[in-house]
Regions:
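Short, intrinsically disordered, mixed-charge
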Residues: 20-28, 69, 135, 139-143
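Hydrophobic-ligand binding "helix-grip"
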Residues: 29, 55-101, 107-109, 139
Length: 146
């Protein structure tokens, strides 16, 4: 079973600044509990960099495919053994002075036997996730409406 979902939200940052929030270290700023660990010891945005995250007692291994700050894009391979594996892509596009639209796409394949493991990334739930991300980024940026 495979799930491909995508969504968008707007942020009050230029695309060039916004992409920094979607790097392994940048997500520390706005994602509660996000604490990437680097087997090689040091953070890096280089292609091939491996980092690990944990959520709810489940570990996910990530590999940087590419972080292109000038192009305001990022791509990662990720695997959560026994659950799912796939690719995550982020693209930031300027929409107005100091504002950009963030596009996020997940392409995940089920590794286990329980299709429910992909539900969080299914279309309806993905929209909710994008809303949560939008609010979290806005709160980090100090938006009083967040």
């Amino acid at each position: 079973m495979r799930v491909q979902s995508s969504g968008q939200f707007d942020v009050a940052l230029s695309a060039g600044d916004a992409i920094g929030l979607f790097t392994p270290e940048g997500e520390r700023l706005w994602v509660p509990g996000w604490d990437p660990v680097y087997p090689e010891g040091q953070p890096s945005e280089d292609s091939g960099t491996v980092f690990l995250t944990e959520s709810g007692g489940v570990e996910t291994t990530w590999v940087v495919i590419q972080i292109n700050r000038p192009g305001a894009t990022a791509a990662y391979a990720r695997t959560t053994p026994g659950y799912h594996a796939g690719v995550v892509r982020v693209a930031c596009v300027d929409t107005a002075a100091g504002h950009s639209t963030i596009s996020v796409a997940y392409d995940l394949t089920l590794l286990g036997a329980d299709p429910a493991e992909l539900e969080a990334h299914a279309v309806g739930n993905f929209e909710d996730m994008m809303h949560e991300w939008s609010n979290a980024v806005a709160a980090y940026l100090g938006d009083p409406a967040a």
